[in-house]
Amino acid sequence: MTNIRKTHPLLKIINSSFVDLPAPSSLSSWWNFGSLLGVCLGVQILTGLFLAMHYTSDTATAFNSVTHICRDVNYGWLLRYLHANGASMFFICLYLHVGRGLYYGSYTYSETWNIGILLLFAVMATAFMGYVLPWGQMSFWGATVTTNLLSAIPYIGTDLDQWIWGGFSVDKATLTRFFAFHFHLPFIVTALVMVHLLFLHETGSNNPTGIPSDPDMIHSHPYYTIKDILGFLVMLTALATLVLFSPDLLGDPDNYIPANPLITPPHIKPEWYFLFAYAILRSIPNKLGGVLALVMSILILAIVPILHMSKQRSMMFRPLSQCLFWLLVAVLFTLTWIGGQPVEHPYIIIGQTASVLYFLIILFLMPTISLLENYLLKW
């Protein structure tokens, strides 16, 4: 008798996607981050749903409703900190997932890669709007500064700003619509994840060698499900440790002060996972130029497949490209550090140098080194 998971209309879709899915036998732990992101998304949707039951999206009561959740709701503090620190875990996994794609040449699956970039933008938008909801000082001023960047767009910038605000400044209308979008976007992200997986299963997974692995495939279950479960345990242990021992480690103390339009914080900055892009934005003195650089810092991922000049797909056997890749990682860490520093000497020049290096490595040095490696292969 045929197994029900292979005949049932719904179960056979799940079976072909997760159970009997053929996968390369050489996948390393770097391939765990896709499933970890799925767990992060599930945690965020669940905790967010319960938080939304108690939150009020009104400027007069938003801050107090978050305080009420932490003090009066059963395990409300746990929900709140799981949600806030879960976002940090989400971005750690997201950046490692993208980094793995860059290192092992997964961007050659262009449809999967492009949907991934859309996902990255959607998750960033969701996180930004979520940061505004507690209505603390950094929430309010972060929203004001970030949305004000749209005014740099010629002709329509100011109108676009006021349209997003729902008035002449960040106020009640802004908070209400941000809450609506923040609640709605994770479900759009979930739909995009399904499209991402659809395209991935059309081509099959890449592997560390970058060589087609059709003759050497194994079932996803039980081999990779066990491996994924180990990843879940490690990540959830790290998240639980962060939430239970140091829940405010990655947050900003200014967000415990209620939003006040009359008092500007000494240093307005976004959450840590946006600091690299914020540093690139600040490194250009011109407002429009800064906004373009900010958008390009993420959108540049879309042209990485075009810039792939190497005869080998993966960087596993390309030591020169590996050196450049880790230099790029160091530059991103530098930009993240600079984004959290005040705008003064020597941070300004360090930020500008790191920003130039970031674009230089991706646009020029990577393709050039790839061509050099191709030449060295002839020796």
Swiss-Prot record:
One of its GO terms (molecular function) is metal ion binding. Signal peptide: none annotated. Binds 2 heme b groups non-covalently. It is found in: Mitochondrion inner membrane. Pfam families: Cytochrom_B_C, Cytochrome_B. It comes from the Eukaryota. The keyword Transmembrane applies. Heme b b566 binds at residues 97, 196. Its cofactor is heme b. The chain crosses the membrane at residues 33-53, 77-98, 113-133, 178-198, 226-246, 288-308, 320-340, 347-367. It is a multi-pass membrane protein. The keyword Ubl conjugation does not apply. Belongs to the cytochrome b family. Heme 1 (or BL or b562) is low-potential and absorbs at about 562 nm, and heme 2 (or BH or b566) is high-potential and absorbs at about 566 nm. PANTHER family: CYTOCHROME B. This is Cytochrome b. It comes from Artibeus lituratus. The gene is MT-CYB.
